[in-house]
Amino acid sequence: MAAARYHDYRHASNPLSDGMIGEIPLVEFGADLHQHGGTRIVPLDNAAVLGCSGPATSPGLCANFVRIRGGEALVTDANTTSQLLFVMRGTGTSSAVDADGPPISWKAGDLFTLPARSRRLHAAHDDAALYWVHDEPLLRYLGVEATQRQFTPTLYRREAILEALEAVVRDPSSATANRLSVLLGNRLFPGTKTITHVLWAMFGLLPVGADQAPHRHQSVALDLVVDAQPGCYTMVGRTLAADGSIKDARRIDWQPHAAFVTPPGLWHSHHNQSGQPAHILPIQDAGLHTFLRTLNILFSRRRPDGTTEVADQAG
């Protein structure tokens, strides 16, 4: 009974706004973290700011850069329900450790997911770097161990991703679309349309001259810039101005194979003034949020008369 506490609701109803728990920071992680040095895992760790045990990039997810020198290998082993790995550069294979199953051969631009109990040995044929996102911080907070696999290892080839994206671009209805992107899904999750039951992944094209209208959602986004030239950037802020733009926005300039965190609930928009197309890969915990019905995704949209509205469909 010594642990029991009683709080006045008026002073405990919103611990985040009261500063009792830390906000998820808008933070950038440069590509230099994985471009040099030895074979290693580099957690993109915000645990000290979040006030939780780490490593953790957000309260529920951990993003990492994995660098593997050519001819070398390392093991990833985490208590997760869902893992996602995107190959930024290099070629290699990922093999199950202490388990059956065929190895996954990968190259730059490929993406693959791994379920619970997936201890893997990643061997690089040449210098390689992967972006590794998983939900171990969520399980650590819940005090549980993942034992049941909700899906099987799944590979998304670069060619298939680009083919699906090109189909979206060629669709006549995309001429007025605010976003040109493909959501990566799994047949086991038809309701959420997400890549795992927890994780959400989108491969998006940012065309030349694009000025996307802002949108927001309650899931965190751990964004990886796949490729971009100077002049591509994201604007992030708390509120919208009367014209639908983001008020007092902070600018995040894109750098190839760098990552940044878009905190939940903030409006954000992507822009391309570089003269070259760019691509981005946001990873979110939106699979879980969609299942819980807490995603609350909203889009700013300009009406024909020039005014703006907020809608719950991308359009």
Model regions: which residues?
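Conserved metal-binding segment of the jelly-roll/cupin
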Residues: R69, I104-D126, V133-E136, R251-S274, ...
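A short beta-strand-loop-beta hairpin characteristic of the jelly-roll/cupin
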Residues: R69-A108, V225-P256
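Double-stranded beta-helix
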Residues: H125-D171, Q273-G315
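C-terminal functional regions that serve as terminal interaction/effector modules
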Residues: M1-P25, H36, V220-G315
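A short, N-terminal "cap"/entry segment at the start of jelly-roll beta-barrel domains
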Residues: M1-S58, G143-F203, T307-G315
